[in-house]
Amino acid sequence: MIRSIEGLRGVAALLVALFHAYVYSRWGGFPATLGVLQHAWLFVDLFFVISGYVMAAAYSDRLDSGRAAFGYMIRRFFRLYPLHVVTTATVLLAVLGIQTVKLVLAHQGIRIGREEPFGFDFFDLKLLGLDMLLLQGVGIIRKEIHNYPSWSISVEFWLYLMFALLMLAVRPRVARIAASALIVGMSVAYFLVYWSSAPEPLRTLDTRGLPRGMLSFFQGVLIYYFYRWLAARPKSAAGSPAAAGAPVVASAAAMTQRMGVLSAAQVAATVLALYLVDRQHLLGTAQLVIPFVFALVVLLLVPDRGIVARLLHTRPLQWLGLHSYSIYLTHVTVLTVLDWLGRAVPEPAKHLVGLLYLALVFGMSMVTYRFVEAPWRERGKVLAARIESGDTFAREGDPSLPR
């Protein structure tokens, strides 16, 4: 995994967790006043871009048969589904606990909130069934149910399948690039047509369904092919064997210059991305450019060098990246328990609640990563390897197992 991309994923997961607490759950105060945090839901689109790039880099040359595609989907299923099931269960238990407390207090004449205890369809078995079938985010329902960030996990799973089918059906590289570009173009067209007749509040990327994921995921695929093309270009004379005797100072100066250009481009793209996220509510249809700028940021980080890349290499951000999926899916459980406190406590004490929230999210994420995410991912690799090779003796932890 490219370390700068890993760190970027961690930052995005943290921002989404803060958004759901301070903005979505209306804790208010700082940092909810920051425009970037108010629109941090957009960083889900960054996740999709990263996923598209990673899938293309890891699998575009390996998905050459139905058996390979089946093994790939097994890996992706075991990567996503076990943690989804566990965190959906923890959210259900948290809601059950909170509602039970409300019910007990209601019998004592103490009313909390406007809703009656258990006065909503959170435990509707039909909704839970859609959740467990990973259909909650594809557009069948519009409700935010259970572990509501998991809508994007639902979309991502079906994007994985779309990607595998595309790689199987279209073999020439140019045709794959054209197909991916067509999917991106169709997704843009979908939003433009939808927004042309939608009420003003609905003219936003903050929607659910496959088109939003397709728009960003297949940009990630295009990034991979573009970077691969760049890497395959003939090297300049400075990098050719004929220039082997060139002065070391000149070579170092050229490398320093290239690094300076890359760093400047990374900073500019990052600042532009944050500016557009901050101004999303004012952009109208121009907000469609935001996923494209995210794609540019990812492209500039792929070399894993430059000033922004070095920042993302730092230990705290690498830790966030390693635990980003767990952070993304566990934070709603913690938020369910602390929600009333975050809204009730004024500043500056609210910041203590925020620190407690993050501490609990990080702690829970460490547990779920160690006991759910990582071991089940390894089991998926073992099963996929058996399917692909017919080797029934594959074992967990075998370093030869593909990722």
Task: Give residue ranges: language-model regions.
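Membrane-interface helix-loop-helix regions
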Residues: 84-153, 189, 196, 290-296
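Juxtamembrane transmembrane-helix termini
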Residues: 44-78, 83-109, 221-228, 302, ...
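Interfacial loop-to-helix transition and helix-capping segments at the boundaries
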Residues: 2-3, 32-44, 142-155, 196-219, ...
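Aromatic-anchored segments of alpha-helical transmembrane domains
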Residues: 14-22, 138, 183-195, 267-279, ...
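Alpha-helical transmembrane segments of multi-pass integral membrane proteins
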Residues: 213, 217, 260-374
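Specific transmembrane alpha-helix
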Residues: 44-60, 152-169, 180-239, 245, ...
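Membrane-proximal cytoplasmic C-terminal regulatory module of class A 7TM GPCRs
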Residues: 314-316, 375-403
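Functionally critical transmembrane alpha-helices in membrane proteins and complexes, commonly lining
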Residues: 3-62, 78-85, 126, 324, ...
